[in-house]
A protein has these predicted regions:
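General helical structural elements
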Residues: 7-9, 23, 50, 81
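Exported/periplasmic ABC-transporter solute-binding proteins
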Residues: 35-67, 71-72, 76-82, 89-92, ...
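Sec/Tat signal peptide C-region and signal peptidase I cleavage site
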Residues: 30-34
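Bacterial N-terminal signal peptides that target proteins for export
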Residues: 2-21
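Intrinsically disordered, low-complexity segments enriched in glycine/proline and serine/threonine
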Residues: 6, 10, 85, 125-127
């Protein structure tokens, strides 16, 4: 298909997914050799990317070369000139910002959802009815990710803002408590910054994190329990793809992630697929 004809067709498609589907399908048809795909991905997607490399790599004749970090930090690396074919972000904000800078090939595409969970020790007896009061209790140390550099922090701040709607002043108090813990954690060696280590060393009492990672944390530390944030307070995280180059292999990988098999991988890794995968 000639490029001009492709552009005309894209102009008549009304959704980002339609744009991506057509462009990725055309690129897949024209690809004749294996390529490496440089993937920048949110840390919460380690399992997904590993499964993609295992499942999609052989099927699509590609090699996935991943780099993990906070989505905001990864976006900044791209803005500074580092090469990546795909950004798999824990939000749509970073992909949209890259689009606004003219760095994307197609509009950002949502591919998964998540939930926020409150992690605490089972002995604390945290419930949906009392978790806000527990977080507000002066002695309780609450951990979140850092906003801006990591969408997990932005989602936690959004949760605090939602709490503030019915409890004025609570949002600022919770942000202050979380910021204090962040400042303390920043002084630690990177290897010891994980939530499990912070709970083990009794440096935190509660953590706001993605529910997709709570099962692994509870497996490592059976004394911990996770509680899904009530739906009316949850900011409902949405994950997005930024396709940054016309690398045919990258486009095939992005399309695979949106396929039934890709959405099945999303579900298997404890995230919420946008579409119910066929089993």
């Amino acid at each position: 298909m000639a490029k001009s004809r492709l552009n005309i067709l894209l102009g008549h498609l009304g959704t980002p997914l339609a744009h991506a589907t057509l462009l990725l399908a055309v690129s897949a048809a024209g690809s004749a050799r294996a390529d490496t795909v440089e993937v920048f991905a949110a840390g919460s997607l380690r399992g997904v990317v590993s499964a993609l490399a295992k499942e999609a790599g052989p099927a699509l004749n590609i090699e996935v070369n991943p780099s993990f970090g906070g989505s905001g930090t990864l976006r900044e690396r791209i803005e500074k000139g580092e090469k990546a074919d795909l950004l798999l972000s824990a939000d749509l904000g970073s992909p949209r910002k890259l689009e606004s800078q003219g760095r994307t090939v197609v509009p950002p595409i949502a591919f998964a959802r998540n939930r926020l969970c409150v992690i605490s020790r089972k002995s604390a007896g945290v419930t949906a009815a009392n978790f806000v009061d527990r977080m507000l209790s002066p002695p309780v140390r609450v951990k979140t990710s850092a906003p801006i550099v990591d969408p997990g922090g932005d989602y936690a701040w959004a949760l605090f803002d939602e709490i503030d709607r019915t409890r004025p002043g609570a949002g600022a108090m919770l942000k202050g408590k979380a910021q204090t813990v962040m400042n303390e954690v920043a002084a630690m060696a990177p290897a010891s910054q994980g939530a499990a280590a912070l709970f083990s060393s009794k440096q935190i009492d509660m953590s706001i994190a993605y529910c997709s990672g709570s099962a692994a944390l509870e497996k490592d530390m059976p004394e911990l329990a996770s509680l899904e944030v009530p739906a009316q307070l949850d900011p409902h995280p949405i994950y997005g793809i930024a396709v940054l180059t016309s690398n045919p292999a990258a486009m095939r990988l992005a399309l695979f992630l949106l396929s039934d098999k890709g959405q099945e991988i999303i579900a298997d890794e404890n995230l919420i697929p946008l579409l119910e995968p066929r089993r």
